[in-house]
C-alpha cells in the first residue's frame, strides 16, 4: 500500500448487471472477489490499473480522474521514469496525500532500460528514490524492471534486492524481458536473487504475440502473473476514432493508426456487435476479453475523462459467453 510520508492470475466473479450508483460518501473498496492475486505474493489488484501517463497531460483533470477511478474500487496506479512523467507523479502524490483512504492504493513503478534511462544497478536505485520523493511516499508496492541491454541480469537483480531490503519496493515483476531472460532470472532466483512475481507485456486483441509465444509459455510455467500494457492497442480498440487521420490525433496516434486495415476493421465490427448486445463500449468488450485470458492479473488503462473511466471499468463486470469469445477469435485471426 502507498504509505505517505508525514507532513489467470486470480480469477474473478463476474455478472452482467450494470454498475451500481457511485457512493456519495465513504470510500468504495473493490470486493475481494474482484481483486486478483499477483503471482504467489500477498499482493492483489483490481483488474484495471490507472496509467499515470494520462495525468501528465494538461487537458486532463488528474484529481477528478483519480477520484472516479477510486470510486469504482480501483486501487492501482502505474508510474514510470520516462521523459515528461514527473508531472503525473506529482499529481498522483498530491492526490494521495489528501485522500481519506490513501492506504488502500497500490503504486506500480516502471523503471529500466532505454537510451535515456539505462538500468544500471546504481541508477535503478537512484531513480526509484527520486520517484518516491516526487510521489511523497515511502515505497512502491510493485516494481516493474526492464533489462539494461548489457546482459547484466545478476547485477540488476542485486539492485532489486537492495530496494526490497530497504523497504523501498514491495515486490518486483519483469518488464520487456525476452523468454530467455525470464528463464535466466528464475535460475538466478534459485541462487538467492529476488524472484519475479509477474511479467509486464503488451497484450490486446490485436497484439498477443508475446503472450501467445515463448514468453507467455515461460511465464505460465513459472506461475507468473501477466500485467498488460497497451490493452486497447494504443486507443484503436476504443472505437471512437477509426480513420487514420483521426487516430493520429491520439497520444499514441502513430501506433494506433498502424492497426487500420482489414483485420482492425473486423475486430471493431465484432466489438460493436457484442457491445450493442451487452450495452457496453468497444473498449469495455476488448478489456473483458483480455481479463478472461489465462494468467492475466491486471491491465493498465489511460482514460482521458471520468466518462472514459466509467466505460472501461464496465469490463470488470462484463461476462462474455462462448459465442462472444469465438467471434472475437475469428475476427482477430
Regions from the PLM with identified roles:
Residues 2-106:
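N-terminal binding-site loop/beta-alpha segment at the start of enzyme catalytic domains
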Residues 39-44, 93-106, 132-137, 161-164, ...:
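Acidic (Asp/Glu)-rich catalytic clusters
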Residues 103-115, 199-203:
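A short, structured active-site edge motif that brings together acidic residues
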Amino acid at each position: 500500500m502507498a504509505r505517505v510520508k508525514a507532513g489467470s492470475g486470480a480469477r474473478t466473479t463476474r455478472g452482467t448487471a450494470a454498475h451500481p450508483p457511485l457512493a456519495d460518501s465513504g470510500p468504495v473498496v473493490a470486493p475481494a472477489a474482484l481483486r486478483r492475486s499477483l503471482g504467489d505474493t500477498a499482493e492483489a489488484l483490481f483488474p484495471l490499473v490507472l496509467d499515470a501517463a494520462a495525468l501528465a497531460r494538461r487537458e486532463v483533470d488528474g484529481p477528478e480522474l483519480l477520484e472516479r477511478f477510486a470510486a469504482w474500487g480501483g486501487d492501482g496506479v502505474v508510474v514510470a521514469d520516462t521523459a515528461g512523467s514527473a508531472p503525473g507523479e506529482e499529481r498522483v502524490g498530491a492526490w494521495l496525500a489528501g485522500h481519506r483512504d490513501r492506504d488502500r492504493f497500490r503504486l506500480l513503478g516502471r523503471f529500466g532500460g532505454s537510451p535515456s534511462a539505462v538500468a544500471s544497478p546504481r541508477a535503478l536505485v537512484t531513480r526509484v528514490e527520486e520517484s518516491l520523493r516526487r510521489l511523497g511516499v515511502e515505497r512502491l508496492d510493485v516494481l516493474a524492471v526492464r533489462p539494461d541491454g548489457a546482459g547484466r541480469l545478476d547485477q540488476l537483480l542485486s539492485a532489486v534486492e537492495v530496494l526490497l531490503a530497504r523497504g523501498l519496493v514491495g515486490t518486483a515483476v519483469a518488464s520487456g524481458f525476452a523468454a530467455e531472460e525470464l528463464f535466466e532470472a528464475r535460475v538466478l532466483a534459485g541462487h538467492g536473487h529476488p524472484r519475479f512475481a509477474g511479467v509486464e507485456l503488451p497484450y490486446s486483441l490485436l497484439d498477443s504475440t508475446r503472450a501467445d509465444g515463448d514468453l507467455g509459455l515461460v511465464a505460465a510455467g513459472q506461475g507468473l502473473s501477466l500485467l498488460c500494457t497497451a490493452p486497447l492497442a494504443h486507443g484503436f480498440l476504443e472505437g471512437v476514432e477509426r480513420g487514420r487521420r483521426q487516430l493520429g490525433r491520439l497520444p499514441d496516434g502513430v501506433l494506433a493508426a498502424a492497426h487500420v486495415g482489414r483485420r482492425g476493421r473486423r475486430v471493431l465490427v465484432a466489438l460493436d456487435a457484442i457491445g450493442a448486445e451487452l450495452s457496453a463500449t468497444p473498449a469495455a468488450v476488448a478489456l473483458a476479453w483480455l481479463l478472461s485470458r489465462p494468467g492475466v492479473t491486471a491491465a493498465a488503462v489511460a482514460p482521458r475523462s471520468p466518462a472514459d473511466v466509467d466505460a472501461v471499468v464496465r469490463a470488470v463486470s462484463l461476462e462474455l459467453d462462448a459465442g462472444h469469445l469465438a467471434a472475437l477469435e475469428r475476427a482477430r485471426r
